[in-house]
Amino acid sequence: MALVSVAPLVSMRRSLFSSPYELKSIDKTIPNLVMCRKRMSGTPSIRVSSTTSASNDDGVRRRVGDYRYNHWDDDLIDSLATSYEAPSYLERADTLVEAIKDRFNSMGVEDGERISPLTDLYQRLWMVDSVERLGIDRHFQNEIKSALDYVFSYWKEKGIGRGRQSAVTDLNSTALGFRTLRLHGYPVSSDVLENFKDHNGQFTCSGIQTEGEIRGVLNLFRASLIAFPGEKVMEEAEIFSTMYLKHALQKIAVSSLSQEIEYLLDYGWHTNLPRLEARMYMDVFPQDTIYEQKLVELAKVEFNIFHSLQKRELQSLTRWWKHYGFPQLSFTRHIHVEYYTFASCVATDPKQSAFRLGFAKMSHFVTVLDDIYDTYGTMEELELFTAAIKRWDPSLVDCLPEYMKGVYMAVYDTVNEMAKEAEKVQGRDTLNYVRQAWEPYFDAYMIEAKWISSGYLPTFQEYLDNSKISFGSRITILQPILTLGEPLPHEILQEIDFPSKFNDLISVLLRLKGDTRCYKADRARGEEASSVSCYMKDNAGLTEEDAIHRINAMVHNLLKELNWELLKPDCNVPISCKKAAFDICRIFHHGYKYRDGYGDATIETKNLVKRTVLEPVPL
């Protein structure tokens, strides 16, 4: 798809990423908490949309969202059972891991080169790509590095063939090699793809569309998605390969290849979830050799062993959800199960339990607080809650209205508990740092509440400066990554967290993408300000369709910048932590793939929960 000119946006690029947490002046008056036990006024100061209002038991007329209740029956979650915790499955997995390590090692020069020098490069790349896409790569990190070091030692400006002694370069091997090496931090240039153009500077194909050619173009498509800013050849590769693959789907029979193409065209890279891809890939993976069969068997056994862990974690999350009274909050979205599913689709190492549960809880907070601040709460209640959070004092819970008390204590207890969990890894108390991250988040919410109350529509830049904070991506990322097992000194943490460009890119991307999916529903609830409406305000005469088109073009370009911030060489930040933050960005991007996947569980989201959490894979 061709890129769109975004000339009106160029002038705001410099301010787009400057001082993201420098808030504009707002009324700083804090309610007197000593007097807060007095009866609260029954008159809200937020404007009410007549189409989305309801009278609560307290007599206050409030705006409410049109949300459905929890889609997942608690009894169903409590009754989840699995036999894959049995020692026999763990033992089988260990046996398969050793067999596959032997296969990796058999490709080494020191072992006599049991594979041909005409295919040795592609065989190594195929093995690395296979274990990664099947979701079992955590067992083979040393083997992966050894294989890629070998491939890189034969990398040339014109690409590679299938083997080190191949006479000609090969698109499939080169595209797969380029993608895999770049993702693993090797310094490879996209200029290598120029060698697969014709004399007119165009990517070409034979027209026959053999399976080998199709797979080559498929890997070209995969490679094109990890483009850096300014890489024109990657844009051209994406356009060419997308058109080619869509055309191929119309010609080839339904097969494992067609299913693979459909999946990759659908989810690409920035909306792909590794566990979902693994679930798809094990269904279409070839099993013609004993080693291919062992790869698939290990993937399935590991999938189901992890499924047994998911069961326990999901049951724990449900108990937490009930303990703090969230089921009684009928005005808000109940999508904690979905958030846990998303987390377990990107963090598949059993050791990352704190990350998965932490992300699910933080995301649930962001959702509930969004519904309170944007829709349900009165200005007086919001000021009380904000002041109480900033004081970080549980005794102040008595000052809050009933529906806020459980939310306050859930935030207070969970943030404190996660700080203790992080201290085991970081060797220092991070609570104060985390609290400082929460404060601008609530300040941003208060600004939006005042916009809603007064009917004020800000400029696009004013809106973005504030709303990229209120989106809450920093809240959902910060504490989970502190539990990952990698010590992050303060100066390193700030290269992932605020004030890094990496953090800001994620915040801006998700706000822009989310608004293109949510702005109509938000407007119906009385929330006029969105990137779409504010952009239209700044550009009189522009239609909604044009505004969305231009914002999507912004997102497309910003994704390239995010690729660079993630993969740029000579970075001090552990790639595992940066990748975890990037994966959280992919989670939210995935939810906005077709529509607002967080306003209500979509068919796609429900299928995701069933396919990756509730149902084991048949062995």
From Swiss-Prot:
GO MF term set: camphene synthase activity; magnesium ion binding; myrcene synthase activity; pinene synthase activity; terpene synthase activity; tricyclene synthase activity
Domain of life where this protein originates: Eukaryota
Q: Which reaction does it catalyse?
A: (2E)-geranyl diphosphate = (1S,4R)-camphene + diphosphate; (2E)-geranyl diphosphate = (1R,5R)-alpha-pinene + diphosphate; (2E)-geranyl diphosphate = tricyclene + diphosphate; (2E)-geranyl diphosphate = beta-myrcene + diphosphate
Residues the entry annotates as binding Mg(2+) 3:
522
Record's keyword terms, sorted:
Chloroplast, Lyase, Magnesium, Metal-binding, Plastid, Transit peptide
Q: Name one Pfam family in it.
A: Terpene_synth
Q: Which cofactor does it need?
A: Mg(2+); Mn(2+)
Position of sequence motif DDXXD motif: 370-374
Q: Name one GO cellular component term.
A: chloroplast
Q: Which family does it belong to?
A: Belongs to the terpene synthase family. Tpsd subfamily.
- Name of the protein described by the UniProt record: (-)-camphene synthase, chloroplastic
